[in-house]
């Protein structure tokens, strides 16, 4: 059986900007806050980290900085997927060379590859590296999704460790868990589905909300891992309004606003993303109030 890269809550960490550049000092502070808050792994340069608007040099600077600052205290997972197989391989190999523990590779967006194309794409990336690869299925953003049969085929690859499943398709998730061997791990890609997916056999979440409430997301996943699902359900419900507010506009617009409201980093975004509406900002500010004392 393949070893599980992490169980629990991995933060999909935001990228703090400062003018035209990345604020690496603020990034260090965010990493330390996550580790102190009990986060079980850190995902750098994912969707929430605005990877699509980062240059190659910026991505590598963030990945290297994360590896150095974390210093082996928790696993570091680098987002290395693009809609070009060759570019994804190059970024994956570069991330491996600076010491990341695993890679997160999104389904190629815009191209709308067939299932055979997806198998070949992910297999080519996994062939090119010697560290675990996590698939990332988010069809609402990419325009294409994996089937359970595709996961079953990919699960045979020794370097493919599992999937961040952000489709919220529970038929797909159950089929995947039934078809794939136990060593193929499923992680929730949606904060609001964490307890439900873990009740089916998922091992944790790659979380947006953990940027704001790392302790609570860690606690939620630990309760699930301990089969304390009644308590987990209570905490999931407590987090519901906050999670809803964090997705009232497209991610990561609300979470960047939340980080600024809490004084954790600038809420600056890169175009084509822009700041959220005043109406939604009021909703977010209200949802944050019960958690301000824990931040």
Where do the protein language model's features map onto the residues?
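A general structural signal for well-ordered alpha-helical segments in protein cores
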Residues: 27, 59, 63, 88, ...
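Active-site beta->alpha loop and helix N-cap motifs at the rims of alpha/beta catalytic domains
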Residues: 2-11, 15-143
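C-terminal alpha-helical cap/extension of soluble enzyme domains
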Residues: 8-16, 33, 37-39, 199-202, ...
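Gly/Ser/Thr-rich beta-alpha loop segments that engage phosphate groups in nucleotides
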Residues: 10, 48-51, 81-83, 145, ...
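Alpha-helix N-capping/helix-start residues
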Residues: 19, 24, 56, 148, ...
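Short secondary-structure transition/capping segments
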Residues: 54-57, 90, 115-118, 146-148, ...
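Alpha-helical structural signal in soluble globular domains
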Residues: 37, 61, 65-70, 94, ...
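Catalytic alpha/beta core domains of metabolic enzymes, predominantly
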Residues: 127-128, 139-247
